[in-house]
Every structure is written in C-alpha cells, then in structure tokens.
Amino acid sequence: MSTMIFMYFIYIVLYASGIAANLSYHVHEKRSIPVWWQRVSRIDPHAFLPLTIALAQQNLEHAEDYLLSVSDPSSPQYAQYWTAEAVAAKFAPSEPTARKVMSWLNQSGIAPAGVRRSKSGGELYMNITAQEAEKLLHTTFYIYKHQLTNKTLAICEKYSVATFVEKYVDFITTTEQFHHGLRRRSFQDPEPRMPSGKSPGHYVELADDSFPFPYLSFGSSVGLLKNKILSDSLPSNCDKLITPDCLRALYHIPVRNTSHPDNSLGIIEFTWVGYLESDLDKFFNIFQPSMVGNRPKFESIDGGFIQTLVPSFAFNGEADLDIEYAMALTHPLNITNYQVGDIWSLGNMNNFLASLDSTYCSAVDPVYDPIYPDPTPANPPLPSGYNSSDCGTHKPTKVISISYAYEEGEFSPAYERRQCLEYLKLGLQGVTVVFASGDHGTATRDGMCGNTVIDSNQISDHEPSYVPTFPSTCPYVTSVGGTQVPANGSVLDAEVAFDTIITSSDGNVSSRLTSAGGFSNVFAVPGYQATATRDYLQRLQNKYTLPVNLNVTGFGSGRGFPDVAANAAAYATAVNGKLVKVYGTSASAPVFASVIAWINDARLNMGKQPVGFVNPVLYANPQVLNDVAKGSNYDCANLPAYHASSGWDPVTGLGTPNFDRMLDLFLQLS
C-alpha cells in the first residue's frame, strides 16, 4: 500500500468513526532562545510555515545495551561493530509510530493530502499556515531576527502535542527563514566570528630566541608494540613549556615509521577557525623537520574552507594547535581536517553529524544550528553561501577529536538528548569520539555563575549553580579534562590538575583557567560510571565541605565528567608566524585522541577492530591510566569547587593516558 493511500485510509476511518478533536495536550519541548535571536513581532497568521515532525525512533530503550554489547570488555560481542545501514535500520521509526502521529494530525484537521513522509520514513512534512500551526501545537509563533546575519526566523518558545502521541514524536521544527532584508556585507566587513561554544583561546607569546631547549631529533623506529621516547635523555622544562617530546615522555606515546592504511584520526574545526600552512611548517621545522610540507587530508562540509582572510590567534590558534600536535604525535598516520560551515553561516556539531548520518538531517534546528543551503548572495571577492546541504555525504574517521565545549544550559534537553544519541550510534560503528571538557572549572565561559537549571524538559530560573559542559555530559563520548606538570617538576613527576592564571600583555586583565568538570543536569549517570562517581562522592563528603553553590539537580545522580585527562598547560604552538604558549583542554583532546589512534593502529595490524567507545573498558580498568590526585578546579567565585583525588574525580577523570598499559590491555581484548 502506498504511503498516500495509507494516509487517506487513516483519514477516512477517523472521519467515519466520528472521533472528537477535543484532545488533551502536554508541553513537549520548552526552549531558551539563544541571545543572538531578537524577537521582532508576531507572525502573520496567514503566512505559510513548513513544519517537520521527526518521528520517535524505535528501540531507544535498548540503545545503551546495544552500545555496551560492542564496547563492554566482558561482552562476547566486544568490537563486533555495526554498519551504518544496520544502525539506521535498528532505530528507524516504526509504522505504528507513523500511524499514531498521522491520526493526531487528522483529528486536528490536517488533511492527509497535505502531509508528506520522507524517503527514510523518519519525518513527516507539511506546509500549513501559522494560524493552523499555532492551533495544532498550542503555541504562539514570533518572528525573530539574528543579530549577526540579519536572517529572520519563525520561532515558538514552547509547543505541545496531544498526550496520546507524545511518545511517538521526537521533535517538531519549522524551517521557514524569511530572507527579506538580508544585508550584503562588504569585503571590509565580513563580520568574522568565533563558532558558538568556543572562546578565542588562551595564549602567551613566546619569543623564538627564548625557546628553552634545543630540538631533539627522532630516534629510529622500533617494533610495533613497544614505545621509544624521542631521545635517550628526557626533555626538560616541561613544567614551563610543553612540546611533542614532553608529551611522548609523559604518556609513553610511540614513534613509528609506518601506520596501518585503514587507520584514521579526524580533527573538527568550524568556520572561521582554520590552520595556516606556514604555521604548520614553522612548527615542524622546530620539532620535526622531516614533516615540513605535510598537510592533513581536507574534507569540506557545508562549504567548509581553510580561512586565511583574517589571520589572528582567534581564528588560527585552535586549528594550528590541534593539527600541529595531532600530526606530530601520530606521524605518519594521515590526519583528516573536517572543516564545517561556509563563510557566512559557520557550522557546528549538528551540521557535522548530519553529514555522517542522513537520518539526522531533520534534527538540524534553525534556532540553534546553521541551515544549508545558505542563500547569502556573493559579494566579491567573498563567495556566495553554500548552495547545497551535506546530508549523509561523509564517513567518520575511526577517532574524532573536538576541542569545543558548550554550556549544557545553552540548548534544550531534547536537542542535547537527540545529539547524544548520534554519538552512541558512532560508538556502535566503532568510532571513538573525544571532546575537550572546557577551561573554566564549574563556571561559564565568561567565568560567571550559572543561573539556569534544567529539569526534564522545563527550563526555569534558579539560584546560582555550577555549569556543566556539553557534549562532555553525554555519556557516549569520552570527555578529556586538563592536567599540568607541577611547578619545577619533571616528566617523571605525577601531574596535577590544570590550574593556570593568564595575564594580558598589559598586565591589566587576568583569567583563571581550570579543568571543567562536574555532573550533568540532563543525563543520568551511566552504569559503567556509577561505582566511580559514588566512590568519589563518598570521599568528597568525608574529606571536604560540599561546595556552597552546588545547586544542581545532577549532583550525585547525573553523568560525571571528564572521563580522562591530558596536559593542558603551555603548549609551544606556531600561530601567525610566532611561537606562543597555548593553554586549555583544547590541547588535551587531540593528545588523548592520538593515543587512541596508535592503539587502533596496533589492533588493526593484528587483524582486530578499533577500540570504539572506550569508556566501559577504562572504567573497568582504571589502573591503565596515571591517576591524578592533587589540585582542584574552581567556581565562579574563584574558590575551589571539586577536588582531584585517587580514583575518578570530576576534575581529571580517571587520569592521564599511559600508552604502554593501555596498549597491553586493549590488545588482550578480542
């Protein structure tokens, strides 16, 4: 039976049976509108709104079990990963779900002829008037204008669905963008800006002639499974300046001459952030001359490009840091640079995830996410917006590193849960997803106290609270916190929690940077982590007074983060032709990802699969990491928040990588 005939059949049955349209409703989603959208006016009730209803996926109650079956070291199916097609089929909305939602639409006066189902079967599309949409969703639509792009969008702050279909609806969005009044920018006014969720970065300039120790050349390659430190002598001054040598010494990261052809590591950057080729060569010339001229593989998503129009630390520092260290630590493995977003609309994680999974494309939300195709006209020498949409057009690398952190309260819980499920799906396919935890302890990116607590789907003002970061709070990613070599210490000393005060060049402004960590207000503690978080809370209560402004719903029951840590202090980085010291967990994430990439390489050479989602293995075997038991992160009042301790803690997680111990463990697994 065709979809259209099926819809008419439902409509006729409902009409003939005289079902009443007087239904009970419940708020399905309430959202906090981002600050960059400003309300302009009520929408014209006769304006047409394209609505997308994403149908609830099936088997969600089993999703975590599916992931654990391939990532729990005790599972007989460990590392028996699924194909992308198998994942899509397992979670595709069922036919009964579609019928339930269609019955609601029909009872609400929406004729079947006006409803179209997507090819994947996961969405229902309709084009109805604003007045009809408001009646259907028990809401009010307003026109909002984006403060940076001048685009306008129809947005409702909350919407409801009939109670009997609530569990069958994932989310509902309108994709209508009203482009009248779109401002043409001049080349002198491109309005470059940082991607959402990213501060400009933290660095101190370092004169080349102050470089504290000479370049150390590579040693010869050794066997596949054993590590060789770069030089016979250990690097010095790593408490003052981190280099690739320091990281190899700290974490026993190997040096190789070859890598498995199927191995891969991806680094994600969002426009306007991009590396400079001259910076890569400057870095390699100092630390690894044989790599001069090497470049990462480039993959453009939704118009992504390597931005060189506005060279500055804000736009080049992050990408230079990520790619310089990932390439140096994993050479000769090929690194992929995923560049997301065109010059006008930028890009974010949802755009990236949609490029990997065509069933996720409807989840790209115009309130939070850039929408492609981008209709912005060309303004020579600047190009027009990207005139297509990369929906399921790319493949994931085996490890993906992302040095971006958002505040969990920036998005609706429904948005975050839907995105989190995509990370679970990547884990099912054997992909390791690594996120930086953030650099501001339990405060916001601006060092402020949080004032929003999310309870289920409701958002309400609350007393000052700790601010967890997302996606680190998603239980299906590996969150990386920060550490540093203790003052006047060496690479042989145990590291301490990352805690650095950065002072501006004029000495007037200082900022405290500490490893972000804490507990989610949206996601419950996962089973693989439950013992670790319970033990930490017991130690915390026995040794310290609980933080005074810990007014969060997730404390003791929410997903704890970070999971692991790596050095985050004073990375020697070539940026805009200068050598600078860069700080933050932005550095920690690609370092940990590089360790995982080398473990994958060894497993692939033995005919095994990559390690995929590593958290269950690491929490079951914390002894393979270097425990960090000193230091703390800080809150918005510049007071200690959580303390590092033996075992897992919400500052440094389970600790820093020890490649040799981790490798031995993962090679023992099937």
UniProtKB/Swiss-Prot annotation:
Q: Which GO terms describe its biological process?
A: proteolysis
Signal peptide start and end residues: 1-20
Its Enzyme Commission number(s) read 3.4.14.10
Q: Which residues form the active site?
A: E318, D322, S586
Cofactor(s) recorded in Swiss-Prot or TrEMBL: Ca(2+)
Q: What is its main location?
A: secreted
Keywords for this protein:
Calcium, Glycoprotein, Hydrolase, Metal-binding, Protease, Secreted, Serine protease, Signal, Virulence, Zymogen
Cofactor: binding comment: Binds 1 Ca(2+) ion per subunit.
Q: What does the UniProt entry say about where the protein is found? A: Secreted, Extracellular space
* Gene Ontology MF: a single term: tripeptidyl-peptidase activity
| Any matching Pfam family | Peptidase_S8
Indicate the enzyme's highest-level EC class: hydrolase
Q: What is this protein called?
A: Tripeptidyl-peptidase SED1
Gene source species: Arthroderma otae (strain ATCC MYA-4605 / CBS 113480) (Microsporum canis)
